[in-house]
């Protein structure tokens, strides 16, 4: 590159950086495009890829995210971003902007899953039996990317952005602990996102209202009378009883639920004897149940108890059911605020065009982001990463799950754009001035 061209490039980049927000006060639609351009810079992209790979190599389960939190704090320190830690055991809460109202929050989850990674690549998990199989490494990276974009334009922010690096989304209800910690008081809105292997790279998706199901867990112990497998007549077989229970539980959805009222019951664990010739005294089964509507969720919960105890009794066994709520509360449905969804859609279309926005149907997965939405207006969305020219990607929670790192600039710039535009829209409204 010639000296003149180099000078011209530097001047253009300086102008883009210096007027990213101030110029956009006259043309808000340019903010997402400008942030995306900055996030796609080679140096910025390489920085995000490096962070994501470091997190991926060292996965930590819920409330164990010690090293992940250290990485987050180190990067925030480099940016000059202030933060609180620990919050909700291992969480980190960062602050960018004026320190005064209005306040808007951005959230990323940090925890991994107890899964052995089966993808062979240079940055495979170094921790046996643990893997980032749901993209939380990418979520954390994208929020750090958003923090960097926002910090570079902090003087132009019309309020304060709260960066929520949350622990324990995978069953630990870390969001609930964040809310209970009181760090989101006076926050006007919170935004979160999730990677999607079903959407094309550069596509964004969400919907107004009901987005994801409420979910709960159950564990049932079915007790009979143990004995020799060759002499079943002298035993009361809890394995057979549990098998009948599992089949009967499937009738709750196929024969009792309205087909237009989506529900799911899945038995995912079955534990009995370790010996091939022993009928055990008891069997333990466990699983998840989900529903989009709170009323249906409660009805399903009641029927699970009835079916398990009654079917056990028919087979001359006893049964107890535990919904494990002392360990983890059930997750409410994820419901997007109507006003925030319209706002999100406008920002998404401004960034990538209407052709890259997809209005999704409700899905039966669940998210503890719903706990934020119970406390303050919130919006959750999906960022696509599927390369249409390649074979379909593995689903989340698979040992073969992979993240297309090309999506990182899209998520980082979307989060930064949502926060910036929200503060600009809210700066003229009355707000409480302290967190």
Curated annotation (Swiss-Prot):
**GO biological process, alphabetically ordered:** auxin metabolic process; regulation of systemic acquired resistance
Q: What is the similarity comment for this entry?
A: Belongs to the peptidase M20 family.
Q: Which residues bind Mn(2+) 2?
A: 134, 136, 194
- Which Gene3D superfamilies does the UniProt record give? 3.30.70.360, Zn peptidases
**Record: residues binding Mn(2+) 1:** 134, 170, 397
Please indicate if the UniProt record lists Signal as a keyword: yes
Keywords, ordered alphabetically: Endoplasmic reticulum, Hydrolase, Manganese, Metal-binding, Signal
Which GO CC annotations does the UniProt entry carry? Answer: endoplasmic reticulum lumen; nucleus
Q: Name one GO molecular function term.
A: IAA-amino acid conjugate hydrolase activity
What start and end residues bound the annotated signal peptide? 1-25
Pinpoint motif Prevents secretion from ER by residue range: 432-435
What is the protein name given in its UniProt record?
A: IAA-amino acid hydrolase ILR1-like 5
UniProt xrefs under Pfam families: M20_dimer, Peptidase_M20
The Enzyme Commission number assigned here is 3.5.1.-
Q: Which cellular compartments is it found in?
A: Endoplasmic reticulum lumen
Its annotated function is as follows: Hydrolyzes certain amino acid conjugates of the plant growth regulator indole-3-acetic acid (IAA).
Please report any disulfide bonds recorded for this protein chain, giving both cysteine positions: none
Upper taxonomic classification of the species? Eukaryota, Viridiplantae, Streptophyta, Embryophyta, Tracheophyta
| Broadest EC class assigned to this enzyme | hydrolase
């Amino acid at each position: 590159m010639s000296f003149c061209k180099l000078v011209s490039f530097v001047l253009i980049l300086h102008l883009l950086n210096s007027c990213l927000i101030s110029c956009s006060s006259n043309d808000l639609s340019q903010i997402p495009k400008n942030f995306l351009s900055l996030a796609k810079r080679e140096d910025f992209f390489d920085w995000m890829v490096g962070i994501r790979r470091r997190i991926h190599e060292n996965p930590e389960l819920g409330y164990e995210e010690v090293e992940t939190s250290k990485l987050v704090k180190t990067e925030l320190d480099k940016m000059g971003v202030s933060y609180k830690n620990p919050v909700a055991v291992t969480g980190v809460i960062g602050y960018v902007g004026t320190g005064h109202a209005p306040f808007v929050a951005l959230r990323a989850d940090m925890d991994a899953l107890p899964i052995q990674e089966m993808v062979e690549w240079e940055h495979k998990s170094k921790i046996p039996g643990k893997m980032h199989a749901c993209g939380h490494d990418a979520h954390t990276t994208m929020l750090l990317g958003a923090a960097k974009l926002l910090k570079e334009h902090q003087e132009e922010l019309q309020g304060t952005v709260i960066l929520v690096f949350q622990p324990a989304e995978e069953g630990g209800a870390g969001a609930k602990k964040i809310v209970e910690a009181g760090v989101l008081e006076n926050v006007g809105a919170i935004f979160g996102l999730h990677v999607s292997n079903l959407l094309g790279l550069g596509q964004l998706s969400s919907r107004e209202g009901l987005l994801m199901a409420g979910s709960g867990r159950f564990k049932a112990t079915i007790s009979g009378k143990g004995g020799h497998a060759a002499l079943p007549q002298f035993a009361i077989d809890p394995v057979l009883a549990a098998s009948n229970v599992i089949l009967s539980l499937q009738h709750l959805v196929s024969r009792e639920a309205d087909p237009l009222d989506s529900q799911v019951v899945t038995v995912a664990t079955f534990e009995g004897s370790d010996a091939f010739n022993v009928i055990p005294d008891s069997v333990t089964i466990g699983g998840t149940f989900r529903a989009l509507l709170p009323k249906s969720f409660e009805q399903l919960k009641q029927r699970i108890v009835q079916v398990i105890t009654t079917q056990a009794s028919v087979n001359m066994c006893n049964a107890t059911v535990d919904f494990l709520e002392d360990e983890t509360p059930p997750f409410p449905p994820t419901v997007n605020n109507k006003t925030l969804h319209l706002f999100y859609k406008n920002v998404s279309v401004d960034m990538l065009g209407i052709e890259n926005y997809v209005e999704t149907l409700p899905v039966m997965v669940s998210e503890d982001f719903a706990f934020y939405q119970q406390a303050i207006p919130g919006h959750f969305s999906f960022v696509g990463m599927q390369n249409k020219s390649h074979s379909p990607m593995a689903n989340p929670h698979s040992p073969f799950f992979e993240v297309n790192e090309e999506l990182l600039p899209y998520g980082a710039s979307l989060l930064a754009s949502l926060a910036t535009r929200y503060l600009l829209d809210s700066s003229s409204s009355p707000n409480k001035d302290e967190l």
